[in-house]
Regions:
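Gly/Pro/Ser/Thr-rich low-complexity, intrinsically disordered segments predominantly at protein N-termini
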Residues: 1-192
């Protein structure tokens, strides 16, 4: 969930200075500093499950997996975000002059919240597509069994796939990992 903190336009340097001294995380989008609010139990559980699935599947392979607390810089938009889950090939590439901001994800996953789902699907995805290394995007619904996947096939061409049955297999071609939708939603309870 994202809640707005300020309406003043900031410079990226001001944002980065705030983040160094802040106990809370913020995203930096179009000059705005936006507080990242706490998520629901389903959001946390799904993020944790995906993180675990990827870590186990990629053990011994040249990837690092990050969940929720690793900042990503989107250079073309000069945005800073904290994706729910990222797969990053090693060696990790960091923003010049920084030791805490990644620039080369191949896979990004976002667990959708009611307040951010349109933003995650539209503006955020458009920004992520500008990252040269970015190959695959997962949008995971926390309110019903549904995973949407965008896979890059070549420059400016993406294939969309949707999964809504527990037995459906999601194939992440960018990192050669496959898992069932049912595994991702294990022990998740949907409220009416």
């Amino acid at each position: 969930m994202i809640a707005q903190v300020q309406t003043k336009t900031y410079q990226a340097e001001e944002y980065l200075e705030l983040e160094i001294n802040s106990e809370e995380r913020h995203e930096f989008i179009n000059g705005e500093i936006i507080l990242i609010a706490g998520g629901t139990p389903n959001h946390s559980e799904i993020t944790s499950i995906l993180n675990s699935v990827l870590r186990v599947s990629l053990k011994g392979k040249p990837y690092s997996i990050f969940a929720s607390d690793q900042r990503l810089w989107v250079p073309q938009f000069n945005n800073y975000t904290y994706p729910d889950v990222m797969a990053v090939p090693r060696p990790i590439e960091l923003q010049s002059g920084r030791t805490d901001t990644i620039t080369n994800p191949v896979l990004i996953a976002e667990v959708l919240s009611k307040s951010t789902k349109a933003y995650d699907r539209d503006e955020k995805f458009a920004a992520y597509r500008s990252i040269p290394s970015f190959q695959e995007y997962l949008l995971i619904d926390q309110y019903r069994l549904q995973v949407q996947q965008y896979s890059k096939t070549e420059a400016n061409k993406w294939i969309f796939s949707e999964y809504s049955c527990a037995g459906d297999l999601v194939s992440l071609t960018s990192i050669s990992v496959e898992f069932s939708v049912g595994d991702l939603y294990e022990n998740i309870e949907f409220s009416e």
